[in-house]
């Protein structure tokens, strides 16, 4: 039988469908853990897998979705080995009937159920270790041959991931376990599938494009989407995945929306309707299709029989659309008209991959380089070179000063931030990690890791949440031998300087030769040309009047080769008066030669003017929209500065700044920022930006002149409300929401300490119980709600996870609690939620119930008798505020 890695992306493959809902039909009780059936009822698990294989699944998942040491501290290895044996038994059984079939086994693992820092309390490295313990028990089976000739497991399926950072931890754990065991990457492909909402965002705010950028950088074999939505609701996400990805895309929707019938969870889309919708998704080009919650072997059988794919060439691989990728692009894919429904016989779509398009990403934003995209602005100010105050901040550990440098550059228009914290007298690795952590908390921009030390580079790339830029490599063999393996492991867009053992060539031809050498060496490591951005090196014209020409010629030559280029623009004007004008003019000339990106100071107005005008005149500013918007803001800025009688820049958060710290809200009703002193008070501003230290300092200052209650009502709560509304409008995302909550928490801490000292301690708004229901160990959503409720001054009684109904009722009676919040992630535990609600209504009739979680809908909540359905954390907060008025 052909190895899975040899057929991935070359022909349409079918995955299996749901597990939990099918096992419920086989007798799985509410709260019972499916993994225990691997040893308790192995014949039923074998039958489950066999039914999917017989229905047409090429790949089935092992029954190990929740197999973590935290859940099974004593029997993890036994359950995992049994799960793999059960799947292999099913495969051998179906091969007797269909000896020429292609049948593969995916080792399946889901989310660990905890939020990673800074959103939660799980450390990134602890998360990696958690996944490693699971993989260490499973992956030896990838070295053990099955009777069919393949290994007992043929790929890794990391699925139902709500957080890109956890996805990265899982992928690194898989890669490092494979390396420890000597398993080649091609022998055990890694597939990662995330959960997206209707707005195409994960819980932590990632988009399909940001996930593709990071996961492809990490070297996964396929990316995808599963769970949460039905096939029609998934359509925008699937289209965007297929547009962005150059690896195969997997699609596994739910069978619509869940509801409870006779105590069991069922879904509202029948098999025939499910397949009709899947045919529409197939037009976008996913090469792996299956089902998730609510789907059964019947669904997979009908899916396979009605999606017959002719041809199996590499051209069928899902990839970027025929038009180059652009950030924010929402055009239909080439070959697919909007709303197209495919015929029953489908041929894989052919995608014209554009190798000259590179990208970097943060958790929530992707930036594309090259092609029709605008030259990218990389902010240079987080760098101690020539900056006395910055050096002092590094020596003193003044992280807030450094973070403000990043925030100012983002507001001024930077799209990527360079991060260099190298000073001989400090621990650069420790400082780099601290700055990276804090910057990623307060800015949406991708970062460029700028260091000459390999250990600092590796630590930073490992910690970074996204796909970063890496500054830098050069043509020296020793440097390439050191840097390329690190970048290959973690991913990144690598800046490559055109210098080698002989120094910096004066002429363009020799610089181009070094670039070609770097490309060739990178290819040996499997690093694509689109992941290399050549820096032709801008030299000072004050010492060589022809230096600018040599650099521009190199930019043009690399561009004509289909390569990407970046420059530290300001070097060209070193030693000259009025440097900003020389630098801006050189910037324009280089953009005309094909420059992809510039490391520059976005606070210099001439540079921004040059960039705006170039985009306008080169056809990169459709309908002149960006230029007109900017010119209006620029006019206001000049009027303000003129009225002050001098130059300078406007302060952070002022109305005339060019952009907000988060993306625009896409045309929805604007959110008015809190009032007080300027556009925002210092405290509100600190909360909005998630600055804990600043929030505490601003609160202490306010307490000198202002009553505590006034601070809460006029500064603190307005800041939280502002972030909450932007979260609801999808212009801020969960990381920013939780960082704002942490900043508010530090402010509340100062207020409480002051009130205790003065004997004025106030009572909380009310008591609220929260719990994850019996049988469910996932508490991510519950913990998010807890953080927000506490910051709105509620006393939260957290009963934890896997909580029996009787325990909830007892706690409610004890404190006569008015509101109980219940959470569930898995469909198999909704029955326990219904049981808890019924018991609460009977024993505690005064209490209201609020429910939430990945499987919940308004209809579902109504069916099980809940008083309120919280679609997200802020929805729950608003309900609590209304209830406790």
Label every PLM stretch briefly.
Residues 1-311, 328, 335, 349-533, ...:
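Domain-level signal for soluble alpha/beta catalytic cores
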């Amino acid at each position: 039988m052909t190895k899975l890695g040899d057929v991935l992306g070359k022909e349409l493959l079918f995955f299996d469908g749901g597990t939990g809902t099918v096992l419920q039909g086989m007798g799985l009780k509410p709260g019972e853990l499916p993994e225990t059936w691997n040893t308790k009822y192995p014949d039923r698990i074998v039958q489950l897998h066999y039914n999917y294989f017989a229905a047409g699944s090429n790949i089935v998942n092992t029954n190990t979705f929740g197999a973590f040491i935290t859940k099974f501290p004593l029997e993890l290895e036994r359950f995992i080995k049994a799960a793999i044996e059960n799947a292999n038994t099913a495969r051998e059984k179906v091969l007797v009937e269909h000896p020429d079939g292609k049948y593969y086994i995916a080792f399946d693992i889901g989310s660990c159920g905890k939020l990673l820092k800074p959103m939660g309390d799980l450390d990134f490295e602890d998360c990696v270790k958690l996944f490693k313990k699971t993989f260490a028990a499973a992956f030896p089976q990838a070295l053990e041959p099955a009777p069919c000739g393949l290994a007992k497991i043929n790929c890794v399926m990391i699925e139902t991931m709500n957080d890109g950072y956890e996805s990265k931890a899982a992928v690194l754990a898989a890669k490092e376990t494979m390396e420890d065991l000597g398993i080649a990457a091609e022998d055990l492909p890694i597939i990662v599938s995330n959960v997206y909402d209707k707005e195409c965002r994960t819980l932590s705010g990632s988009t399909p494009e940001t996930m593709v950028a990071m996961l492809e950088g990490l070297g996964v074999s396929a990316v995808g989407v599963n769970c949460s939505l039905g096939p029609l609701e998934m359509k925008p996400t699937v289209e965007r995945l297929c547009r962005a990805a150059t690896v195969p895309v997997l699609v596994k929707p739910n069978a619509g929306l869940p509801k409870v019938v006779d105590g069991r969870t069922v879904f509202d889309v029948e098999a025939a309707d499910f397949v009709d919708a899947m045919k529409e998704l197939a037009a976008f080009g996913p090469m792996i299709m299956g089902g998730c919650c609510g789907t059964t072997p019947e669904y997979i059988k009908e899916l396979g029989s009605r999606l017959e794919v002719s041809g199996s060439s590499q051209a069928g691989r899902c990839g970027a659309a025929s038009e180059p990728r652009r950030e924010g692009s929402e055009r239909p894919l080439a070959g697919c008209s909007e709303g197209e429904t495919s015929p029953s016989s489908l041929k894989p779509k052919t995608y014209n991959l554009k190798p000259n398009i590179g990208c970097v990403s943060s958790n929530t934003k992707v930036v594309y380089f090259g092609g029709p995209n605008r030259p990218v602005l990389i902010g240079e100010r987080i760098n101690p070179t020539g900056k006395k105050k910055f050096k002092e901040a590094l020596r003193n550990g003044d992280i807030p000063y450094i973070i403000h440098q990043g925030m100012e550059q983002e507001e001024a228009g930077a799209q990527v931030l360079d991060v260099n914290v190298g000073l001989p007298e400090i621990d650069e690795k420790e400082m780099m990690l601290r700055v990276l952590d804090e910057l990623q908390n307060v800015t949406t921009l991708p970062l460029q890791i700028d260091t000459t030390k390999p250990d600092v580079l590796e630590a930073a790339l490992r910690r970074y949440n996204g796909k970063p830029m890496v500054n830098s490599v050069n043509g020296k063999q020793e440097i390439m031998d050191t840097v390329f393996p690190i970048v290959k492991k973690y991913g990144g867009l690598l800046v490559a300087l055109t210098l080698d053992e002989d120094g910096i060539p004066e002429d363009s031809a020799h610089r181009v030769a070094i670039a070609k050498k770097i490309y060739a060496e990178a290819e040996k490591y499997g690093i694509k040309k689109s992941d290399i951005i050549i820096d032709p090196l801008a030299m000072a014209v004050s010492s060589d009047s022809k230096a600018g020409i040599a650099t521009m010629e190199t930019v043009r030559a690399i561009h004509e080769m289909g390569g990407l280029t970046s420059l530290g623009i300001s070097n060209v004007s070193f030693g000259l008066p009025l440097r900003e004008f020389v630098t801006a003019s050189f910037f324009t000339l280089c953009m005309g030669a094909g420059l992809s990106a510039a490391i520059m100071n976005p606070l210099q107005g001439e540079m921004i003017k040059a960039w705006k005008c170039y985009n306008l005149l080169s056809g990169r500013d459709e309908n002149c929209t960006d230029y007109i918007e900017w010119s209006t803001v620029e006019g206001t800025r000049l009027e303000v500065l003129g009225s002050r009688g001098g130059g300078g820049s406007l302060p952070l958060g002022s109305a005339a700044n060019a952009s907000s710290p988060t993306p625009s809200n896409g045309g929805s009703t604007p959110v008015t920022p809190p009032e007080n002193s300027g556009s925002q008070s210092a405290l509100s501003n600190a909360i909005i930006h998630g600055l804990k230290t600043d929030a505490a300092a601003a609160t202490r200052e306010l307490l000198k002149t202002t009553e505590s209650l006034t601070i809460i009502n006029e500064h603190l709560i307005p800041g939280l409300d502002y972030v909450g509304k932007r979260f609801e409008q999808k212009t801020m995302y969960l990381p920013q929401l939780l960082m704002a909550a942490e900043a508010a928490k530090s402010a509340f801490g100062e207020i409480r300490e002051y009130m205790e000292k003065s004997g004025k301690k106030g009572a909380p708004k009310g008591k609220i119980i929260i719990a994850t229901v019996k049988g469910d160990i996932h508490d991510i959503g519950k913990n998010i709600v807890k953080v927000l409720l506490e910051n709105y001054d509620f006393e939260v009684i957290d009963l934890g996870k896997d909580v029996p109904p009787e325990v909830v009722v007892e706690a409610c009676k004890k404190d006569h609690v008015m509101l109980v919040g219940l959470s569930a992630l898995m469909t198999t535990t909704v029955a326990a939620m219904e049981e808890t609600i019924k018991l609460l209504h009977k024993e505690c009739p005064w209490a209201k119930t609020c429910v939430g979680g990945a499987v919940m809908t308004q209809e579902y909540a109504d069916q099980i008798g809940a008083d309120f359905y919280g679609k997200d954390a802020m929805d729950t907060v608003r309900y609590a505020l209304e209830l406790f008025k």
